[in-house]
């Protein structure tokens, strides 16, 4: 994403890891239940992977979204970048990135989806309306505004 410390895309292979590291990636979030990632290459290039196995065409759990958001923050706050992927980089991974934008930039789900779609037009439509995204947004608001009650 232009201007952001996050890269969103499809599953990487061992041959992709040197390039990811060269552009500042220090962490990878792998949303694929069906793919463990190029673990040896990550170790060789000192890239930390967070594996949040999620079945294709289903949204990640709220717990996994929070784990992903915290992982991104950890790497970004240390000066790194994070590559977030699922198989195609359109659904599972885009959901985590959308929630990080809500968390870090204070966007609404609709604003985050519009921002993401502008930079990656082929993400799945309707991510902002996913129940888990709405729940994440409500919990974000409740943390930052004591008059809001999470439902």
Go through each PLM region and give its residues.
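Cysteine-based protein phosphatase catalytic domain of the PTP/DSP
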Residues: 2-82, 102-144
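A phosphate-binding catalytic loop at a beta-strand-loop-alpha-helix junction
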Residues: 76-98
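Intrinsically disordered, low-complexity regulatory segments
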Residues: 145-151
């Amino acid at each position: 994403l232009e201007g952001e410390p996050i890269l969103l895309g499809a599953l990487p292979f061992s041959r992709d890891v040197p390039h990811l590291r060269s552009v500042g990636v220090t962490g990878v979030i792998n949303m694929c239940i069906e793919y463990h990632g190029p673990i040896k290459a990550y170790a060789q290039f000192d890239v930390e992977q967070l594996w949040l196995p999620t079945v294709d065409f289903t949204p990640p759990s709220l717990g996994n979204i929070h784990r992903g958001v915290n992982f991104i923050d950890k790497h970004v706050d240390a000066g790194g970048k994070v590559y977030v992927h699922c198989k195609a980089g359109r659904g599972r991974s885009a959901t985590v990135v959308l929630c990080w934008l809500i968390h870090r930039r204070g966007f609404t789900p609709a604003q985050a989806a519009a921002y993401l779609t502008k930079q990656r037009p082929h993400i799945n439509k309707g991510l902002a309306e996913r129940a888990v995204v709405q729940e994440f947004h409500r919990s974000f608001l409740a943390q930052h505004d004591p008059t809001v009650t999470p439902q």
